[in-house]
């Protein structure tokens, strides 16, 4: 199965999104990457595994971590990170997992903490032969059978269990859940977050949110980041990106109409925003994701 993946990838070397699977588990993207991504975050348990191509790297927090056949990159929920592509190197095929904490909770209740800071104790870890094999088999099956959703979810279950049991201190997760509750406990920040989640205008003024919280701009920024884990601007971009992904997966509206819904002044601005965060444009994202339908 692994060899089939390599042949098919080489046949469509111009693609940037090879496959995208989606469901209750979240998203799994098989990406052929040749450019960097802006600093961003996700509300998911985020795991990055190299499939083939050049070794590469991600910045997690403020530190660079390698992504190779032997090392995975592990990103906690709301942890800022970016992809750093070396233009002098060949492309890299990456299996990117964006996993919903609610789905993981079905395996162990404590795994609800997978969307919280501190779930993975370190952003990098050595890939075991089992994890490598499971990742390659999932990538191969997504390439060969893009619409086999049940098989993909089953393979993903095995992979995520292996990843979490190897890289996360799962026996301490009840404490992580209490910590997660404490970190988001300030009622002023919760109220602002609710407003932000209803906000779609790219030009939202952060001073307005500080005023709503009854805080100075500096105090608001400090309290927001200590409560949520990311600065307000990054959080707004996360919300807008998740709205965009949901629209591309679940709406039949045109990219232009979705761009207008989300408050972008030009479809080109929306496309650039989407590509800078996801690695592919919205049209390609929708086209490839429909292979899994």
Regions found by a protein language model. Give the residues of each.
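Short, Lys/Arg-enriched, Trp-marked, Pro/Gly-tolerant hinge/linker segments that flank
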Residues: 115-132, 141-202, 206-213, 226-234, ...
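N-terminal regulatory/effector-sensing and dimerization cores
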Residues: 13-116, 144-149
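Residues that scaffold the ATP/ADP-binding catalytic core of kinase and kinase-like folds
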Residues: 106-108, 235, 285
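Short hydrophobic/aromatic patch on the recognition helix
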Residues: 70, 219-224, 269-270, 274
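Terminal helix-turn-helix DNA-binding modules in bacterial transcription factors
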Residues: 194-210, 215, 225-267, 271, ...
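N-terminal amphipathic/basic-hydrophobic helices that include classical n-h-c signal peptides
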Residues: 1-8
């Amino acid at each position: 199965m692994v060899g089939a993946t390599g042949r098919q990838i080489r046949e469509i070397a111009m693609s940037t999104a090879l496959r995208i699977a989606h469901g209750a588990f979240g998203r799994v993207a098989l990406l052929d990457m040749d450019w960097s991504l802006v600093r961003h975050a996700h509300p998911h348990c985020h795991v990055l595994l190299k499939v083939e191509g050049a070794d590469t790297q991600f910045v997690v927090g403020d530190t660079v971590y390698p992504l190779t056949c032997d090392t995975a990159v592990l990103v906690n929920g709301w942890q800022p990170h970016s992809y750093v592509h070396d233009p002098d190197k060949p492309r890299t095929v990456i299996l990117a997992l964006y996993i919903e904490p609610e789905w993981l909770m079905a395996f162990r209740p404590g795994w609800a903490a997978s969307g919280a800071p501190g779930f993975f104790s370190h952003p990098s870890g050595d890939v075991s032969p089992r994890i490598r094999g499971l990742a390659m088999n999932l990538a191969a099956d997504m390439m060969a059978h893009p619409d086999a959703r049940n098989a993909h979810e089953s393979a993903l279950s095995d992979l995520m269990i292996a990843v979490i049991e190897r890289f996360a201190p799962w026996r301490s997760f009840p404490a992580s859940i209490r910590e997660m509750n404490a970190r988001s406990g300030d009622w002023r920040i919760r109220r602002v977050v609710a407003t932000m989640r209803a906000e779609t205008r790219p030009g939202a003024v952060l001073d307005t949110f500080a005023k709503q919280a009854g805080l100075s701009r500096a105090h608001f920024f400090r309290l927001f980041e200590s409560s949520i884990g990311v600065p307000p601007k990054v959080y707004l971009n996360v919300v807008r990106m998740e709205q965009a992904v949901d629209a591309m997966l679940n709406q039949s509206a045109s990219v232009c109409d979705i761009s207008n819904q989300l408050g972008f002044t030009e479809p080109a601005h929306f496309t650039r925003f989407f590509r800078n965060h996801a690695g592919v444009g919205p049209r390609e994202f929708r086209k490839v994701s429909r292979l899994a339908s």
